[in-house]
Amino acid sequence: MSGPAMSSTHVVVIPSYDTGPLVYSTVAAARAAWSPVWVVVDGSRDGTAEGLLAMAAGDAGLRVDVLAKNSGKGAAVLHALEAALAQGFTHALTMDADGQHPADRIAALMAESTAHPDAMVLGRPVFDASAPLLRVRGRRVSNAWTNLETLAAGIADSLYGFRVYPIAPLVDILHRQPWMRRFDFDTEAVVRLAWRGVRPINVDAPVRYLRADEGGVSHFRYGRDNALLTWMHLRLLLGFALRLPSLVVRRITGLPPFRSG
């Protein structure tokens, strides 16, 4: 049996916050598919940091960083991206720690990124019967706003966090923004990258919502997180209005992010 694909340019980043035992199987599946894999424990209080550190002690392809306090998904990803950039990595695939994202699709997304290094490779979620209808309908609204804010640049799903980012432009964006540190990270990242001319490539990837009896954990809070998304889209709409003339010129002339191929 062949081992995981190894790369000196592309790294898998898994932020984790109170995910419970599911994080172990998620990390093991990611490691079976890719090397290296970096996990950022974002102030978890569930005791998994110790178990992950033990896994990393016996695995040269696994790195685990433990943050003292919870700062949010975007902050955890930024921590990993800064370290990855310093070590010469150019791209990072982010995936959730709770088993929603398919580790067996890591290689496919990484291959697209290697073939198109100037693009962001976005997972396009394929839902099964486990997907909560309210969540599916809610993301349609957010995706419609994203479509407007990017002048239909081709982002199939702005919320699905299984994706490959070019590291350098995303780190620069995060350093310039006080936001994008929590649930607003995934959507704002792809919108601002598109504004920078980073073209999206969409790749189908199944998503699975685990039940509580399967160990599924959700930190989504309907009121709090929808308020955060509403504020985010207000910011992005203002940014869109300021950038509209240049986006129109890019679309007419076929410049990134609108250029195909």
Give the label of every model feature segment:
Residues Y17-A32:
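Short, well-formed alpha-helical segments that are part of the catalytic scaffolds
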Residues V41-E50, G99:
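A conserved acidic beta->alpha catalytic loop
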Residues F89-Q100:
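Short beta-strand-to-loop acidic/aromatic patch adjacent to the donor-nucleotide binding site
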